[in-house]
Regions:
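Extracellular/periplasmic solute-recognition and catalytic clefts
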Residues: 76, 93-96, 153-164, 189-254, ...
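Single conserved hydrophobic/aromatic residue that forms the stacking wall/gate
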Residues: 1-15, 20
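Detector for C-terminal structural segments
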Residues: 156-161, 165, 268-328, 342-345, ...
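N-terminal lobe/hinge region of extracytoplasmic solute-binding protein
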Residues: 16-17, 21-43, 74, 145
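Ligand-site clamp/hinge motif
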Residues: 53, 138, 169-222, 264, ...
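Surface-exposed binding/hinge segments that line
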Residues: 51, 85-132, 149-156, 302-314
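Aromatic- and charge-enriched surface segment that lines or borders ligand/interaction sites
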Residues: 37-82, 97, 103-105, 191, ...
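Gly/Pro-rich hinge or "lid" segments in bacterial periplasmic/extracellular proteins
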Residues: 25-27, 119-185, 192-196, 203, ...
Length: 548
């Protein structure tokens, strides 16, 4: 099997959390107990408790206990990465209050929020006994002790990981887990080259994968086995927030990006429609919201409830937050972008820049305007080249590269970049993740997700309102107001949104008899099963094709 993030597969298969999010259309924000068979939450959300299932156990047969839960969250708060520490910043006490009960409370100076209990419930629980004799701060290649439906059987670094189903998995009969995890073995193969991965699945070396490159999706999977129905090519639409896929983001620690006029000018230079038509086969939609494809996204002008949140900051916000809807800049998609370029040059002039001998120059210092870009992949670098070339045409000097992924992550997390890219896909109940991505608090933490170094009191206020909302209308008012403030500050140059996920696979698998379009997330990994009749059909069909 090959999925976009093999790490995520490992967490899902080997670990266990107290709650699991339901993936069905009609319950987009529901959580069900996995490790927990009971939960209590106070009316003000300042206190909550979980009761752990008494039959839960680790893969070595020892019980999974409340002591493990307490250890996990104390460790996360003290030594977790910046994102985890930000998410749990309001958490105060974590205590064992019974053989099966664990109690949580928030700090006195923090307000209880509806999202915190469920966010806590989705963290993977760690073994206190295992980490008592192993250093959790050290990198290791030894798979840690798990409690999930699978365990690591074998692996070769950089090549594959083989997971084996745990036959006596304690959670098999938990209601939300029934019917899941039907394969005895799951193998995740690693590839360094996308084209080799494409040829591997067409050659039947791997069974299923996500296709992440639009050109390959549109051109590479039309071959005899697909024409005979032995190989499937499916766009699986997800009725959930799509967010923003790989927008250009700016490091606001760089002085030149601190001027909102410069950021808007850079946004105007980007011709998304042209890039989507020419490079991406017109496959994507424009990500016009941080919460694109959801009720959390802004629409029209601010509502009365949004204005209640925004008006106290009228003097601190761009006027257009109140008077205009944020929309994609007008373009014909054929590179005729003169009006937008003219406006971009006006904004650069207002910010103190002019083109001197073909070079965009700071009029006060005489320094050229330059941008050093790093992209997560060679595909993203290729996708970004029309934007970079457009910048070059107005005198902005650029460099661009796609380093090895670990180096890209290090540079983004440590702020060693000027322009970069990021993948942002919110869930249906964002809150702690918003704080990690956009809050002043996270900007001050090393290695947080706030790579842009956004420090905006209005953004902080609106994130708190999202997290504190008790009613749906208040929640949507807060997300929409936040959406407008982020967009009109031009922190990102939006690009595309992904309408679900593109799955290619050999037709050997049974699937639940449900409408797959009505899901909130991917279900193939844990709900499919091996279908002998289908597998035999594929084998016979391939033999026939080879003989023809």
């Amino acid at each position: 099997f090959k999925q976009k993030t093999a790490y995520e597969i490992g967490v899902r298969l080997v670990g266990s959390e107290m709650c699991i999010r339901d993936s069905s259309y009609d319950e987009p924000a529901s959580f069900y107990g996995r490790l927990a068979d009971g939960i209590w939450i106070s009316d003000d959300y300042r206190e909550f408790a979980f009761r752990i299932r008494e039959n839960a156990k680790w893969h070595d047969g020892t019980p999974l206990t409340v002591d493990d839960v307490v250890f996990t969250f104390r460790h996360y708060k003290e030594k977790g990465n910046a994102g985890i520490r930000t998410a749990l910043a309001d958490l105060d006490r974590v205590e064992k209050i019974g053989e099966r009960e664990v109690y949580f409370s928030v700090k006195k100076d923090s307000e209880g929020t509806p999202v915190l209990p469920f966010a806590v419930g989705t963290f993977a629980i760690q073994s206190r006994a295992y980490w008592a004799v192993n250093d959790p701060t050290k990198t290791t290649i030894v798979p840690p002790l798990g409690s999930g439906p699978y365990k690591v059987k074998e692996f070769v670094l950089g090549r594959y990981v083989l997971y084996e189903r745990v036959d006596d998995y304690w959670g098999r009969e938990v209601p939300i887990m029934k019917g899941r995890h039907n394969f005895q073995f799951l193998k995740c193969d690693y590839f360094r080259d996308e084209s080799i991965m494409v040829e591997s699945i067409k050659a039947d070396v791997i069974d299923v994968r996500h296709e992440s490159v639009s050109k390959q999706w549109m051109t590479q999977y039309f071959f005899p086995a697909q024409e005979q129905g032995l190989f499937k090519r499916e766009l699986v639409y997800l009725d959930r927030p799509w967010g923003m896929w790989w927008p250009i983001i700016w490091n606001l620690e760089e002085e030149k990006f601190q001027d909102i006029r410069v950021r808007e000018a850079l946004w105007l230079v980007h011709d998304y429609k042209w890039a989507n038509r020419v490079l991406m086969y017109d496959f994507y939609e424009y990500a016009s919201s941080y919460f694109y494809n959801s009720p959390m996204a802004h629409e029209g002008l601010p509502s009365d409830k949004e204005l209640e949140l925004l008006l106290p900051f009228k003097d601190e916000l761009p006027e257009r937050v109140f008077t205009q809807e944020w929309i994609e800049p007008e373009t014909d998609g054929f590179g005729q972008n003169r009006e937008r370029i003219a406006r971009a040059l006006e904004l650069f002039a207002e910010a103190g820049y002019s083109i001197i001998d073909g070079v965009m120059t700071n009029q006060e210092t005489g320094e050229p305007f330059t941008i050093d870009f790093i992209f997560v992949s060679s595909f993203n670098l290729r996708k970004g080249m029309p934007f970079i070339e457009a910048l070059n045409r107005i005198g902005i000097e650029t460099t661009a590269r796609s380093p090895e992924v670990s180096n890209w992550i290090y540079r983004m997390q440590s702020g060693k970049f000027e322009g970069g890219d990021a993948l942002y896909i919110p869930n249906n109940t964002p809150g702690l993740a918003l704080r990690n991505w956009f809050s002043s608090r996270s900007a001050d933490l090393p290695l947080s997700q706030n790579w842009m170094n956004i420090r905006n009191p209005v953004v902080d206020f609106l994130i708190d309102k999202v997290m504190q909302a008790r009613e749906r209308e208040d929640f949507y008012a807060a997300t929409r107001a936040l959406d407008r403030v982020l967009l009109w500050n031009f922190y990102w140059v939006p690009d595309h949104a992904m309408p679900g996920y593109r799955l290619v696979h050999w037709d050997r698998f049974g699937q639940p008899d449900t409408d797959i379009a009505l899901t909130q997330g991917e279900t193939w990994l844990d709900t499919w099963w091996w279908d002998e009749a289908k597998a035999e059909r594929v084998e016979v069909g391939m033999q026939q094709l080879r003989s023809d």
